[in-house]
Amino acid sequence: MIFAENGYICNPHFMQSHMEFVDTHSHLYDEAFAGEEDLALQRAVDAGVTKLIFPDIDSQSRENMFAFADRHTGHIFPCLGLHPTSIGADWENEMAEMERYMDRKIWAIGEIGIDCYWSKEFLDQQKEALRIQLEMAAKRDLPVIIHSRESTELIINTLKECRHLGLRGVFHAYSGSLETFRELQKLGDWYIGIGGVLTYKKASIAETVKDIPLERIILETDSPYLTPVPFRGRRNESSYVPYIAQRLAEITGTELSEVAGTTTSNAHKLFNI
């Protein structure tokens, strides 16, 4: 039975199951949660989502992200990076600002990559920023969180050129083919991030994941975006990870407990949390 609590949908099966989940991509520090961040985190913990990876965006939200993480050490693990859609004419200043935080404890370089969906105006700058940040990750022996919206081929070509760096990481919100996944496996220790899109009708990733080993999958929400069914249309949050896990279990014919255990173990291994 599903019931409403404080205006949010809760499922007591998840809350009482003692299964542990990791949300490997949450922007719970986003202004969409202003004044509610701590409550949203508590809902996540109550649902078994005890650890959240916070990918960085840019200087506009970075300080808020670290402040939130500092209040909840052990639950929140912040990262550092310049999001490709934040790369514009002043991108070098943004990069310099980001490097001021390099003495902070971080668990990955990200969210980084190339975005060809919104604009290609600064595509060359996106490519250069990606290379710089891949080198930063290699130097610090950190995983990377890759944003690849309509740019997977470009990023794979970059990874081939940077193979000597020994990179590892996750392709966030993976929407590629099985063939692309197999190509990634030849380039290093790469996982795919599966989120709310998996629950949508006609989502192509639902077919692809059937042939991808569970040992290569980690779960994510991309909160406050990409809300899973049955909550699509409202703000996403980390407490919804179990619904993504449930759908993955249904599609792959796997027990929910196995999905929870394996994806959580994968996240612990990749991010060293």
What residues fall within each predicted segment?
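Mid-domain alpha/beta scaffold segments of enzyme catalytic cores
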Residues: 2-273
